[in-house]
């Protein structure tokens, strides 16, 4: 049955109306920081009266401003009352509902249409076996619907939205308890692809990020980094190794802000992890050739089972975790704020309660961050919710800063590269416009997290903004749109939707001359000409190959005459490449080169002894 928690305000008293069993609350003692927080410098922390009635293991921010919480069995093996909930941060309510199977330890992202996708879960405990099932949640009707099952189960999978709106899933334990080493790709409305074997064994919940070139980058928790090509369905060899010698188990990974001013250079940062944990961080610039990991600044505390949340100003908030796994005695209460511009950490104050295994942090539309959960021991969890209000919401004296206001946004979905308008009376003061992907964190990782800065110009009471150029920069779906004023204060963010785009279609090559296979004599030449076409773009490159010919290659559409000197059979080919980087299948023609000598056989019909017979032959030599 449903359980509803009612509050008068965000920090007001709670009136309980509970008809379902509530999980036990962990008896954690509140941490009291030694130094009083300074809101204008560090931000501030508060604990809500609202509490989580189920173990909040998985969370997803939906485009109606509500947060889907998924618990399943809640890390209690004997619990068959599988649960989910919807939290309304503004109203202060949490409404629970049953789910049809155990979604504990799934992978979850929000589809481009706004529906959360739950992928896999728990088939059996100790040892764990993975579910083959997946489901989508409708934010309007608040119902789950099962979709096509995967080929094999996944417990602890990672799911990632690709640049065309499809969803990739990788790793997890199968229905037999083995590591699932295959990639599957889900197309909304169609179903799952065949399995694509990886050829290597990933960790559980691998850290994956979609890059601006469309490939998927694996950053850990293992030491060797790789990329996956969604077009060829293949993994690269290891392209870089981390400096930290151990695995960063339950550390976090963040794709740092993508900005047009830097050509959307992709940089990934990994935080903490390991047991005992490390405080170290590392950063890789994937525009370098070859890319390599470099140590970043250390956090103030070592963290395993931590959280890392990107804020709308591009800084990254690191919270929770502990030195030793699932150990409240070594919990990390300090909150650290990483600034990519200065490559340094500063203090974001301290939260009050240990946030360990199964804790989560989530950016909300008002620019605050919710910190909740923690489940170091089965049968108990931390039910209290904390809210971090960053320093950008305060003046230097600690009073509330005046925020810019967005009154309207062009109705979506927005097309890539298209212009749209943001109406604001504060247009003349705006210094930055950014999109932040609606979050979906679990197990120390937000699977689709990213921030993309937008180009814009200022008009009379409006901002003329340009959407990201393509889905690899910002995959289709819902984003929080923040505007920032010159004082560094953000607006409250409305949701905007980037339209799903069809997958890039490959171009087609055609050899027009010769139009059929040809036979020539050694020393002759053949005239070549070709064309290329692309159904959703333009052809940008031609590549000819002429085995046995001179020249043996060309990069123009019509290379002209190619000389063949050696007898044999050769296959000439043309391949074209489009503006999306996709190449066509080759167009081919066979060239048969014969010996150039002429042989005549004379067979007269009448011959007399001692007589002479005269014959004549006409030989025509055609030189092309």
Annotate the PLM regions:
Residues 35-502:
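Kelch-like beta-propeller repeat domains
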Residues 404, 503-508, 598:
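Proline-centered linker/hinge motifs at extracellular inter-domain junctions
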Residues 412-416, 517-524, 606-617:
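Short, solvent-exposed loop/linker segments at the N-terminal edge
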Residues 419-421, 522-533, 616-622:
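A short beta-strand segment in extracellular, disulfide-stabilized domains
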Residues 424-429, 532-536, 578, 621-624:
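Extracellular acidic, Ser/Thr/Pro-rich low-complexity tracts
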Residues 486-488, 577-582:
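Short, solvent-exposed loop/turn segments at the edges of extracellular beta-sandwich modules
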Residues 511-514, 528-533, 543-544, 559, ...:
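Residue-level signature of extracellular beta-strand-rich folds
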Residues 543-561:
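Surface-exposed, flexible coil segments in extracellular/virion-facing regions
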């Amino acid at each position: 049955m449903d359980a509803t928690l009612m509050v008068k305000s965000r920090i007001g008293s709670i009136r309980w109306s509970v008809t379902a069993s509530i999980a036990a609350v962990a008896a954690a003692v509140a941490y009291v920081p030694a130094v009083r927080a300074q809101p204008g410098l560090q931000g501030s922390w508060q604990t809500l009266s609202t509490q989580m009635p189920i173990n909040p293991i998985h969370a997803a921010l939906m485009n109606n401003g509500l947060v889907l919480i998924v618990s399943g069995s809640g890390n209690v093996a004997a619990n068959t009352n599988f649960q989910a909930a919807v939290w309304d941060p503004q109203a202060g309510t949490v409404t629970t509902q049953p789910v049809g199977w155990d979604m504990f330890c799934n992978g979850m992202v929000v589809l481009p249409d706004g529906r959360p996708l739950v992928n896999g879960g728990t088939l059996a405990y100790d040892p764990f076996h993975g579910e083959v099932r997946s489901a989508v949640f409708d934010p309007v009707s608040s119902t789950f619907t099962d979709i096509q099952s995967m080929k094999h189960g996944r417990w602890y999978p990672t799911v990632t939205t690709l640049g065309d709106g499809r969803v990739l899933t990788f790793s997890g334990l199968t229905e037999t308890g083995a590591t699932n080493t295959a990639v599957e790709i889900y197309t909304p409305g169609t179903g799952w692809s065949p399995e694509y074997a990886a050829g290597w064994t990933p960790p559980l919940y691998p850290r994956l990020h979609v890059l601006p070139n469309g490939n998927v980058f694996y950053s850990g928790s293992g030491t060797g980094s790789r990329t996956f090509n969604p077009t060829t369905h293949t993994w690269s060899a290891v392209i870089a190794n981390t400096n930290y010698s151990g695995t960063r188990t339950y550390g976090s990974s963040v794709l740092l802000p993508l900005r047009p001013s830097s050509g959307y250079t992709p940089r990934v940062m990994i935080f903490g992890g390991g047991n005992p944990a490390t405080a170290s961080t590392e950063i890789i610039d994937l525009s370098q050739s070859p890319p390599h990991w470099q140590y970043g600044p250390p956090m103030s505390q070592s963290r395993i089972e931590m959280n890392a949340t990107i804020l709308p100003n591009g800084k990254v908030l690191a919270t929770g975790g502990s030195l030793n796994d699932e150990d409240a005695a070594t919990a990390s209460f300090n909150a650290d704020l990483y600034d990519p511009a200065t490559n340094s950490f500063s203090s974001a104050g301290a939260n009050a309660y240990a946030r360990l295994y199964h804790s989560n942090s989530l950016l909300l539309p008002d620019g605050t961050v919710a910190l909740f959960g923690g489940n170091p021991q089965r049968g108990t969890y931390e039910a209290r919710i904390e809210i971090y209000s960053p320093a950008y919401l305060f003046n230097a004296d600690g009073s509330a800063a005046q925020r810019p206001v967005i009154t309207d946004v062009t109705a979506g979905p927005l097309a890539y590269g298209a212009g749209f308008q943001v109406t604001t009376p504060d247009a003349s003061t705006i210094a930055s416009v950014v999109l932040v992907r609606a979050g979906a964190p679990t197990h120390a990782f937000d699977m689709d997290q990213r921030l993309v800065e937008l180009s814009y110009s200022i008009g009379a009471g409006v901002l003329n903004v340009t959407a990201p150029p393509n889905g690899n920069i910002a995959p289709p779906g819902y984003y929080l749109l923040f505007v920032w004023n010159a004082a560094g204060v953000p607006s409250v963010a409305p949701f905007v939707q980037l339209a799903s785009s069809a997958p890039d279609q490959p171009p087609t090559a055609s050899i027009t001359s010769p139009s059929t296979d040809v036979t020539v004599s050694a020393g002759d030449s053949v005239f070549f000409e070709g064309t290329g076409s692309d159904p959703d773009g333009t052809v940008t490159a031609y590549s000819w190959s002429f085995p046995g010919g001179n020249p043996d290659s060309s990069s123009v559409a019509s290379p002209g005459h190619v000389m063949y000197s050696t007898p044999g059979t050769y296959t000439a080919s043309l391949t074209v490449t489009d503006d999306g980087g996709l190449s066509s299948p080759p167009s081919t023609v066979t060239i048969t080169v014969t010996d150039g000598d002429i042989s005549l056989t004379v067979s007269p019909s009448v011959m007399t002894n001692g007589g002479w017979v005269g014959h004549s032959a006409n030989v025509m030599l055609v030189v092309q």
